[in-house]
């Protein structure tokens, strides 16, 4: 069975509490399909999932970037054979971006559909290349953002810019064209090439952040490691109650 790691478990829990349950229960018999790990490359850890064009699904897996076309599973390793931590299926670039450990790049199809890997991190300087775990890859306005353990790399028109953060970055998300990062010092946003604390979220400055999710009414839902969920609209931050706070803290 595909094993979703702790970072991803927060997203699964939130998904379950925000979707309309009636629809789920109505189609429960076909909602979950189980695939044994022997089918998809025996990598027991899967970190992210990215669908593409209603035909393929891509997985950031311990053994590499995994592709599933509805019938066949194919594993594509990175150059350094590290775990793949993140995956982004870009319909604008027609590429599958993947991030591992101190490496990121993209897979692009040849005329016959075969995916070929192109390493991008090899173009960085030695110091900038020490990204650690690449937990997030995002794109907005033709800019690619690659989130490592303590820095973000921006890529535009063949040029790279590295923005370091004086904190451990645990997660990131692109919301309405703005890159949010969750750290062990609260939530920050990237403006140009500078990180700024998220306005209205000062109360979370000492919290470790595990997830940042757009809210349908504007603002973001912030997932903390130990204190549950919060809603921030850029002015104030309040607890976001689901009724499952105790369960999330224990799990």
Where are the model-predicted features located?
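Carboxylate-rich, polar loop motifs that coordinate divalent cations or form catalytic acidic clusters
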Residues: 1-251
């Amino acid at each position: 069975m595909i094993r979703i790691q702790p970072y991803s478990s927060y997203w699964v829990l939130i998904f379950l509490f925000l979707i309309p349950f009636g629809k789920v229960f109505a189609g429960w018999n076909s909602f979950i399909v189980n695939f044994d790990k022997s089918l998809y490359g025996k990598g027991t850890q899967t970190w992210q999932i990215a669908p593409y064009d209603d035909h393929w699904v891509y997985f950031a897996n311990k053994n590499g970037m995994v592709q599933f076309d509805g019938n066949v599973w194919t594993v594509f390793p990175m150059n350094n054979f590290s775990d793949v931590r993140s995956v982004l299926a870009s319909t604008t670039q027609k590429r599958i971006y993947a991030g591992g450990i101190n490496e990121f790049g993209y897979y692009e199809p040849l005329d016959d559909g075969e995916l070929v890997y192109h390493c991008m991190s090899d173009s960085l300087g030695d110091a900038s290349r020490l990204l650690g775990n690449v937990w997030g890859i995002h794109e907005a306005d033709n800019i690619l953002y690659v989130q490592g353990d303590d820095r973000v790399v921006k890529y535009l028109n063949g040029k790279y810019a590295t923005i370091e953060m004086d904190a451990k970055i645990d997660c990131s998300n692109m919301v309405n064209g703005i890159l949010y990062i969750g750290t062990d010092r609260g939530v920050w946003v990237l403006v140009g090439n500078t990180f700024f604390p998220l306005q209205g979220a000062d109360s979370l400055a000492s919290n470790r952040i595990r997830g940042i999710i757009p809210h349908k009414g504007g603002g973001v839902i912030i997932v903390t490691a130990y204190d549950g969920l919060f809603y921030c609209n850029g002015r104030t931050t309040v607890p976001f109650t689901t009724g499952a706070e105790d369960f999330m803290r224990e799990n």
